[in-house]
Amino acid sequence: MKTAAELRQLVTRIDHRSYPAYKDTKGMYQFPGYLLSIDHVQGDPFASPSRVSIQVKGKIAGFPEQLYQTKWQKTALEDALIRQFGQCCEKFGFKAKGSGKSGMISISRCGQEVLERSAAQIDEKTGDIHIRLEVGFPANGRTINAREWIRIFFEFLPECVEKALYYKNCDAKRLQKISDLAEDQQALRDILPKLGLCAFVANGSILPRESGVSARPMKSAVCFQSPEEMEVEITLPHRGVIRGMGIRKGITLIVGGGYHGKSTLLKALELGVYNHIAGDGREYVITDSTAVKLRAEDGRSIKKTDISMFINDLPNGKDTTHFYTEDASGSTSQAANVVEAMEAKAGVMLIDEDTSATNFMIRDELMQRVIHRDMEPITPFIERIRELYEEEGISTVIVAGSSGAYFHIADCIVQMDRYMPKDITQTAKKEAEQFPQLSGPKEKAKKPDFARKPQQGREWKGNDRIKMKTLGKEAISINRETIDLRYVEQITDSEQVTALGYCVKYAQRHLLDGTRTLQEVVAMLEKKIEKESLAALCESTSSVASLARPRTQEIFACFDRYRGLKL
């Protein structure tokens, strides 16, 4: 291992040379208080920035063990360190001058959710901190600018390390509050099933967001207040007693007029699978961590999914136990989404009437009279929803504004009235008695077959040059094959999409051999991440990308939408 002084001498020696000479700097260097590793050097000042990592020994960093002794506290502290380091990076970003991306210093940009990321890792045994960031190596045109490079690595980065990664220079009370909040959120998440709940929304929560492009809380928004009938009281380790609306397991219907807050509540519930930072307004909006938001998804591909519990006897004679299409309709796509959520072991399904296929959700009495059941291949969701709960233990939360069909079967009916919830179960049930209940299914559905066994694609055999590109939160391109993730609505960060791409790449290279089911493949990916870290998906220390951990359910969703998957 070389010293910082040797690195300075090396860069001074290659000053004014052609830009590729920067590649000589690749390696590890001991700086006072930390280890610097230059993992990947960009080939051009206009290319993606160089990848750099910093390691600080636990004894030097000095963060108390109680701040990272549990998994969720560790993730919360890592998130806080990324935010602190990022603030320092912003202070120095582009202060070093030059062409292209010269002087750029960046680290993962965290949102309102607290996610496990490759940008910061703490060793729970030693307290060692590992930070990954990107730096644009300075250039004049396409020649090396050593003076500006030295400013970045010998002035700017040492100050960032000292201010953000040494406990003695951090706000100790703030970090303790972050740790306590993480512990409270996990305690609340753990207690939900014991209370028979699938979700909880604390009184005083701020659910509306600032705008369609901002996830920050809306100013002057109406604070959430639970209906008295649904209010539960929970004691947390640090916050103490907290009260709010408990959504019980079973079938919950959210109704109300337009613009009264139905979809806003559902949106908060769908993102309640993640913990949120202090001040977000949704810190204590907690949902079963396996909950999945479902919708119709016209045009998506379906790969040998067993949708026979909803769709049978198609006029074209297609086998719905191994249904395949490259262009699904609204109803078939939503049927597949439900079955795939079951395959991913979802405990709760979240559905909004606005984004659902009507013929999949309901079939009214008049339509049943005109078009006989024997002529309709679709068994609507309303006829399976009770069975899903009683046989599979899957709860459902549905938002409806135009159809009262679900009044008959809902266990709880909540009306949103000017952003405030009301329990109208008894009133709605009484009114529903005046309307005939639609007939149920002829027989119980056969449990879907989850025996799909993906194989390695031909183009992956012996090919180490597969290219991948993340397209924001909406899609990822692998070997020119685009995986469309626009409607996987619980993806909250583009770095999760990048991680999903690496999941596919790793699986294609090591796991897809035609002998393992998709469930087994995903379980093996999860085990690798849990045991070795998120960065292990990249398989090379020189190519660790900025990754955020997706849930199991999103990993399944990515494979399900991968048109290049061979089954």
Regions found by a protein language model. Name each.
Residues 390-393, 399-567:
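Conserved NTP phosphate-binding and transfer environment spanning the P-loop NTPase/kinase superfamily
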Residues 145, 300, 310-331, 363-378:
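Flexible beta-alpha connector loops of hexameric P-loop NTPases
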Residues 341-385, 389-390, 402-408, 412-429:
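Conserved P-loop NTPase nucleotide-binding/switch module
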Residues 208-243, 278, 286-302, 307-318:
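N-terminal pre-Walker A segment at the start of P-loop NTPase domains
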Residues 193-197, 203, 259, 266-297, ...:
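Carboxylate/His-rich catalytic cores and anion/metal-binding grooves
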Residues 329-341:
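Conserved alpha-helical scaffold flanking the Walker A/P-loop in AAA+ ATPase domains
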Residues 1-196, 207, 567:
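N-terminal accessory targeting/assembly segments
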Residues 242-274:
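Glycine-rich phosphate-binding P-loop
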